[in-house]
Amino acid sequence: MNDSKNRYFVKNTANGSFADIATLFDGVAVLMMTGLSSKGKPVNIYSEQWVNEQEEDFLITTLDENNNPVVIRENVDIELTFIVRKKYATNQENFDVLAKHDAFVDYMTNTDVWLKSAYMGNKYVHCVCEKEYKPTAIMLNRGDNSYMTGTITLHTLDATKVEAVTPQSKQET
């Protein structure tokens, strides 16, 4: 049984619909996704402390349409840790751990993707893999006990967004 079903979602087009990773890639279980709620270091705040003062002067260089300061942050990385194993597949007939692993990694690393976690409500993020990927464990040729694990690091391309919930999309997730 795959306990990660209906918890982690992905799509590879802006207008597409989010699909459950465990359903889209039968046999893949997401173990952990970190960084979705992280905030990067501010890049548009400047401060200076003067020799004869305890207080610092500061400037936030970006303003919104009402002249209110807006902090701009560096984009962060998301880490997606997963396992591919026959026992997590709904259809176990002719299940190939290596082929399923390669298909999943190709999908996640060959183009930009959008990720969403049920643990974070309707928050989602647009990201792309900019780093190399290496499996963390390769245990093949062990019959039904064969598996592969890995962690894919994806760089966010913009700030985390919140998906508008419609009655139809609420039923799907």
Name each model feature, range by range.
Residues M1-T173:
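Extracellular/virion structural assembly segments
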